């Protein structure tokens, strides 16, 4: 406990750190140079040597709270759930979301499909952190990411956890190093933080920080990757779980890079209440709950979009907006299908305004409610990010005379929005329903094949 007491002093400050020059110049703009982090949380990123390469980058992340936290998480739906997923799920169930103190994460080895030994390794990681915290019962969530089917170098990890604990810090450098420690094929660490207030105590400032990793094997079905969120707001566990589930459905579950859902996907949130105030409950009538729902959703959307911007070999960040649908779920399914279509993704990489591929994806989407997609009412457009007029490709089922030169200019940009209107284009026939779903995805390039062809070499 003494180490927490020493390090937490002066925590409510803004910090700055130099940019890692190994990060591609085009990605440095996404890395924060400072941050405002939640009270009572300490973090560290440590080089252990889990990864096969000889890099000296950190590959063991530790996030700890000075006091017990409410905790919640969402996990992968992949049938081959990794050992840390099983262990963390069991801990949260046993503790009912109460009394969680830490999260420990290794990168470089997924500890998935590793049998009884893999489960024992995951338990040992959490137990070692608990020992460092002076605790006798399981209070640490465990995550792993990397190559599937290989055992962890568990001795290396266990031998270095005490050092990782000793190095816990509240500085921006520490948060950035911790975000870097969970990376695999990522080209930059993904870290965000913000402050917020709640209606019940507008004079009180709360803080929210989050880190995530992912660049490939990304497609939601709960989850999509690894992510850890921390806040010093007081939130009851049941409220935290419902808040996270809502936010993830509209953020981490609304991105796609390659259509693959990992065995290890986990997004967790810890709330230690260190900033004080009345606990947020899951009451639908609670203004604090509603406000925090909007705050958390917006925050996780920004965080998850960083994953898309770091998609393996990606050159474009694409928003697909499906609007004027009778049902939200149908709109979501259509957006998801477009986002994972290899033909759509390669056309965008080639700067080809081939709207037929988009239309094809709309047409073969499975599970859409009858009457949702009516060809005579379907429109497709490109929306430039510079605010200039949309480029209509298809209006009410009829193809437009496309200005190929303007289309090429739009597709040269890094950001692009595809708008699919199921209610009659500009008319916006609200009688059909005004439901809208949004997905974020990237294109497919030659480099994606190279990266994944060489993944284990």
Curated annotation (Swiss-Prot):
The keyword Transferase applies. The record marks 223-224 as: Cleavage. One of its GO terms (cellular component) is mitochondrial matrix. It is found in: Mitochondrion matrix. Substrate binds at residues 184, 213, 224, 312, 452, 457. Catalyzes two activities which are involved in the cyclic version of arginine biosynthesis: the synthesis of acetylglutamate from glutamate and acetyl-CoA, and of ornithine by transacetylation between acetylornithine and glutamate. This is Arginine biosynthesis bifunctional protein ArgJ, mitochondrial. It comes from Aspergillus terreus (strain NIH 2624 / FGSC A1156).
């Amino acid at each position: 406990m003494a180490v927490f007491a020493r390090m937490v002093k002066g925590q409510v400050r803004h910090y700055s750190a130099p940019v890692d020059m190994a990060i591609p110049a085009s990605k440095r703009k996404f890395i924060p140079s400072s941050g405002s982090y939640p009270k009572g949380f300490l973090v560290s990123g440590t080089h252990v040597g889990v990864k096969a390469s000889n890099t000296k980058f950190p590959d063991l992340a530790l996030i700890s709270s000075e006091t017990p936290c409410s905790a919640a998480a969402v996990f992968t739906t992949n049938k081959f759930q990794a050992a840390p997923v099983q262990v963390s799920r069991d801990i949260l169930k046993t503790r009912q979301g109460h009394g969680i103190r830490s999260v420990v994460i290794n990168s470089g080895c997924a500890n998935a499909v590793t049998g009884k030994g893999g489960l024992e390794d995951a338990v040992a990681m959490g137990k070692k952190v608990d020992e460092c915290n002076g605790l006798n019962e399981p209070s640490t969530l465990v995550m792993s990411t990397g190559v599937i089917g290989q055992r962890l170098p568990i001795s290396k990890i266990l031998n270095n956890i005490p050092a990782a604990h000793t190095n816990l810090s509240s500085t921006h450098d520490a948060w950035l190093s911790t975000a870097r420690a969970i990376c695999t094929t990522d080209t930059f660490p993904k870290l965000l933080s913000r402050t917020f207030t709640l209606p019940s105590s507008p004079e009180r400032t709360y803080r929210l920080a989050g880190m995530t990793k992912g660049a490939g094997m990304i497609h939601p079905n709960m989850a999509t990757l690894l992510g850890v969120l921390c806040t010093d707001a007081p939130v009851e566990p049941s409220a935290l779980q419902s808040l996270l589930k809502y936010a993830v459905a509209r953020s981490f579950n609304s991105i796609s890079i390659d259509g693959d859902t990992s065995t290890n996907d986990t997004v967790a949130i810890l709330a230690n209440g260190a900033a004080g105030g009345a606990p947020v409950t899951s009451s639908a009538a609670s203004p604090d709950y509603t406000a925090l729902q909007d705050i958390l959703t917006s925050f996780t959307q920004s965080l998850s979009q960083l994953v898309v911007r770091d998609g393996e070999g990606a050159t474009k960040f694409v928003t697909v907006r499906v609007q004027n649908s009778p049902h939200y779920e149908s709109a979501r399914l259509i957006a998801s299908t477009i986002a994972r279509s290899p033909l759509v993704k390669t056309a965008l990489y080639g700067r080809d305004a081939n709207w037929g591929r988009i239309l094809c994806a709309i047409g073969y989407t499975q599970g859409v409610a009858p009457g949702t997609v009516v060809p005579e009412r379907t429109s497709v457009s490109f929306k430039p990010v510079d605010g200039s007029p949309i480029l209509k490709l298809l209006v009410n089922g009829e193809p437009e005379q496309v200005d190929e030169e303007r289309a090429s200019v739009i597709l040269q940009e890094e950001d692009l929005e595809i708008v699919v209107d199921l209610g009659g284009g500009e008319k916006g026939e609200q009688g059909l329903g005004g439901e809208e779903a949004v997905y974020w995805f990237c294109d497919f390039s030659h480099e994606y094949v190279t990266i994944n062809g060489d993944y284990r070499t």
